[in-house]
Amino acid sequence: MSLPIVIIGSGFASYQLIKTIRRTNNDCPIHVFTNDSGDDYNKPDLSHVFSKQQSPEEVVTLSGGDFAEQYNVILHRHTWVESIDTEIQAITANGEQYAYGKLVLATGSQTFIPPFHGDGCGDILTLNSLKEFAGIQQKVLESKKVLVVGGGLIGTELAMDLANAGKMVTLVEPNTHLLANMVPDFISLPLEKACKEKGITVNLSDCVQAVNKQEQGYRVTTSNGHSYYVDCVISAAGLKPNTKLATEANLMVNRGIVVDLNLQTSANNIYALGDCAEIEGKVMAYLQPILLSANALAKTLLGTDTALSMPNMMVKVKTPNYPIQLAGNTSTDIERWSVDIDTQGLCAKAYNINNQLTGFVVTNERVKNAFPLFRELNTTN
């Protein structure tokens, strides 16, 4: 019997890879090691669990056991992988050694918590997995006032979801506008307005400095001298790839686990996929690049080396009070913008120095134009 494909991690990337492999091969042995229950769920659903009043159980689409049975995998639940031996091609988990033919690191990421001062820092919450949701759900439900650190994609979505769930929300972002790494300020200003209309306090160009415990809740102070008294603090200040195992195995690690276009790491027969992988200098924690990566890697693992091809990709900002869709380059090296604004929303097209369309953003009712624009973008690039 051939040595198995061993996958470390049971998140979206891992399970998408397994589903893709099983479309063409139901026989090759696959072992999955995960430190949680291994339940299958749609991670983007975490963006609206509070407004929909969902429980962790309701987010699950397939239990770990049912997933393992349906996709013919051996699932090692609640199991910690301690080390990787690249020489003998084996991992050690819970003190036992397991050999692999191919190893896939799908270890995901963790939410970055900035180094704040104060005795309340250990109580800061994060929401980057089903397991974390289960751990913070009750605390958030009991909270009336919530402060969210970070006004990027995840932070803005979370703040709006909490506001729609009836919470008093404060959003603190060090940049001058929301979604600063994705769009220019003229696009995010209407989003900021929509947040404020929902009762969210949006505090820009400011940073949380300290989180201190009070008799009830926490006092959060910022660099601009603001003080907020809240029941809980949630960090959405970006993601940090989980690279500890890879680093200890002497794999090449930069921001993430460095891989080539075949998603192979610096070691033979070891690959990385998803939020933990760094591809051409970028960590792309979005669904579409993970889907494309899983499709390419499945073919490679089954014997046909397949390089990842990254076309333009669409990103949806799940803010129901002001929906946004964008694709292509919308943040750097843009020569000019062509912007059309009306009562239905905004349509902004980005052009380079050669007057070629390089990206676009549509908002509100104008999101219906996203796919025609996406086709145009792919035609010109």
Curated annotation (Swiss-Prot):
GO terms for cellular component: cytoplasm. Its cofactor is FAD. Pathway: Nitrogen metabolism; nitric oxide reduction. Signal peptide: none annotated. GO terms for molecular function: oxidoreductase activity, acting on iron-sulfur proteins as donors, NAD or NADP as acceptor. Its EC number is 1.18.1.-. Keywords: Cytoplasm, FAD, Flavoprotein, NAD, Oxidoreductase. Gene3D superfamilies: 3.30.390.120, FAD/NAD(P)-binding domain. It catalyses: 2 reduced [nitric oxide reductase rubredoxin domain] + NAD(+) + H(+) = 2 oxidized [nitric oxide reductase rubredoxin domain] + NADH. It is found in: Cytoplasm. Belongs to the FAD-dependent oxidoreductase family. One of at least two accessory proteins for anaerobic nitric oxide (NO) reductase. Reduces the rubredoxin moiety of NO reductase. PANTHER family: NITRITE REDUCTASE [NAD(P)H], PYRIDINE NUCLEOTIDE-DISULFIDE OXIDOREDUCTASE DOMAIN-CONTAINING. This is Nitric oxide reductase FlRd-NAD(+) reductase. The gene is norW.
